[in-house]
């Protein structure tokens, strides 16, 4: 008997030990961030990369707060012999299973094809929900951009910024080929990427087939030909929608003839039935118990309706040509490119169609493009037509090199777009 008791005591002690081990196995937020910081140091030593102090300090700061760090920023360090690399941070995130990253900024760090492929493999993992990706001035080539584009089929990035990477038309084609099957990307920035007129058609197809509603293309070489190819389908779609809206309004204002005839026939039938003989129906007044039961049932039904009304599911972004912001400043939209001298007027006439009919358009930037007096006149008439159609006003910015009265009217009807302040430490670089 005493031996049996000892066994039970031993069993209880073993269960307590296992419970303690299980509690120790659970990681807190601070422990997870501490492990991430230590792993980042280890990976930097293994790959001979400079451990960026700002990354370590930001991890330590959130470790003390016991909050998840969502934003990671990488930029060149002070040590030239030991450069900052991207792979140590990504390896540390993967080894610690840190899935709370949402924003990744990489500035002025040269990225080879291997680095871009490592980043693409990281984004293809479904558990890392990166929503904002910024790769600014990283010397990404056209072949590497194609590999990055293939990763956007499986990730949930909503904003992609690839400014100051000279990958040209070939890289733009590879990137857009991968983005065609993406349904989450909303903002695309390709400022100063050496894009030519051929990229206009590629970007136009992208805007009509995906959910991208904001595009930033400042400092490229699209010229009139590229811009026309890009917005041609958008303008046609906006015009078709305007016609459909007008038809719906006409149908709502004019009542259908069939409904009027049906109402008259119903009224005549009820009057004829009222004149005929009817047997009186005896209705019993409900008792107090029945009344209380009815009121309770009504209250229950109302409560259920309130609960169901609170649950609102966010709909995914609309796929199609729903453009809201177009930034094409400094793109050579003038009469000096290939084509006739009227090419800026033709381009502005197409933009006029888009501005006049699109109900979702909010912003257009045409600064540093010599569109001329005729082009400015087309834009002014577009703003006036939009006002007559009672659509929401848009922000429009153009060059001042045109007729002074035309420019003043453009500022009056389409002003409001402010120049964004340049970020400290990044002179000359424009951010979204």
Regions found by a protein language model. Give the residues of each.
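Leucine-rich tandem repeat or coiled-coil scaffolds
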Residues: 1-432
